[in-house]
């Protein structure tokens, strides 16, 4: 089962307090699990929204001397010209699309689903949103980058999400994924989707982590895009 997505445990879920009419699927960063993010969303939840925080499968990661840890795909390096795990990224995106499909089967239309993630998970959420034919409500991309950026056209994408709303957040003291990566990603996104729908927020003094103000901004973004419908 090594490296097989079926080996990952069931996601951590913050259920809706009443009938769920919208969902947030949020992907954690390298070496983490969904539990901490589920706790964070429990603190900013809205009663009609279900929050799903899946756990990545455990796999050897080249960046960390091939040690096995939860990872959505292999990471070779953190410089702009590092080789990327193309097949792993694409396979992981299919896993996320299957999670979206599952919620659609549960009665939540894809345009009432926000995809998001932190660091490696944020990178995967951006890549999935830009390549899927499932029309999504938005993406919250925290402290991350756009993977396989050379695979995208120079002009706007021809997919379901060319008008998608994106909230991208980054700390200005991030030592792992420098703020420059976030800035370059925002510029790339503005060429691929409607630039009016891309918001970039920078948090002073924040490292490769989250903060209370960022979570409030995430809550505002989610609640604005996924209002109650009953």
Swiss-Prot record:
The modification N6-acetyllysine is found at residue 224. It is found in: Cytoplasm; Cell membrane; Nucleus membrane; Endoplasmic reticulum. Changing residue 119 to A: Abolishes lysophospholipase activity. Keywords: Acetylation, Cell membrane, Cytoplasm, Endoplasmic reticulum, Fatty acid metabolism, Hydrolase, Lipid metabolism, Membrane, Nucleus. It catalyses: S-hexadecanoyl-L-cysteinyl-[protein] + H2O = L-cysteinyl-[protein] + hexadecanoate + H(+); 1-hexadecanoyl-sn-glycero-3-phosphocholine + H2O = sn-glycerol 3-phosphocholine + hexadecanoate + H(+); a 1-(9Z-octadecenoyl)-2-acyl-sn-glycero-3-phosphocholine + H2O = a 2-acyl-sn-glycero-3-phosphocholine + (9Z)-octadecenoate + H(+). Gene3D superfamilies: alpha/beta hydrolase. One of its GO terms (cellular component) is mitochondrion. It is an enzyme of class 3 (hydrolase). Its EC number is 3.1.2.-, 3.1.2.22. One of its GO terms (biological process) is negative regulation of aggrephagy. The active site is at residues 119, 174, 208. The keyword Nucleus applies. Its main location: cytoplasm. GO terms for molecular function: lysophospholipase activity; palmitoyl-(protein) hydrolase activity; phospholipase activity. It comes from the Eukaryota. InterPro entries: AB_hydrolase_fold, LYPA1-2/EST-like, PLipase/COase/thioEstase. Belongs to the AB hydrolase superfamily. AB hydrolase 2 family. Homodimer. Acts as an acyl-protein thioesterase. Hydrolyzes fatty acids from S-acylated cysteine residues in proteins such as trimeric G alpha proteins or HRAS. Acts as a palmitoyl thioesterase that catalyzes depalmitoylation of proteins, such as ADRB2, KCNMA1 and SQSTM1. Acts as a negative regulator of autophagy by mediating palmitoylation of SQSTM1, decreasing affinity between SQSTM1 and ATG8 proteins and recruitment of ubiquitinated cargo proteins to autophagosomes. Acts as a lysophospholipase and hydrolyzes lysophosphatidylcholine (lyso-PC). This is Acyl-protein thioesterase 1. It comes from Mus musculus (Mouse). The gene is Lypla1.
């Amino acid at each position: 089962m090594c490296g097989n997505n079926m080996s990952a445990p069931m996601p951590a879920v913050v259920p809706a307090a009443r009938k769920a009419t919208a969902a947030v699927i949020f992907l954690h960063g390298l070496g983490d699990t969904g539990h901490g993010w589920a706790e964070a969303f429990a603190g900013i939840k809205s009663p009609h929204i279900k929050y799903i925080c899946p756990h990545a499968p455990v796999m050897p990661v080249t960046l960390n001397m091939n040690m096995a840890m939860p990872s959505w795909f292999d990471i070779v390096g953190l410089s702009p010209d590092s080789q990327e795990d193309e097949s792993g990224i694409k396979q992981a995106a299919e896993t996320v699309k299957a999670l979206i499909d599952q919620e659609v089967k549960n009665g939540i239309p894809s345009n009432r689903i926000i995809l998001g993630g932190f660091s490696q998970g944020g990178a995967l959420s951006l890549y999935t949103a830009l390549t899927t034919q499932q029309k999504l409500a938005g993406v919250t991309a925290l402290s991350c980058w756009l993977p396989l950026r050379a695979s995208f056209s120079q002009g706007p994408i021809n997919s379901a999400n060319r008008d998608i709303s994106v909230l991208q957040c980054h700390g200005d003291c991030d030592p792992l994924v420098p703020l420059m990566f976030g800035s370059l990603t925002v510029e790339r996104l503005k060429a691929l989707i409607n630039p009016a729908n891309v918001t970039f927020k920078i948090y002073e003094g924040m490292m490769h982590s989250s903060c209370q103000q960022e979570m409030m901004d995430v809550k505002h973004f989610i609640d604005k895009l996924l209002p109650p419908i009953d």
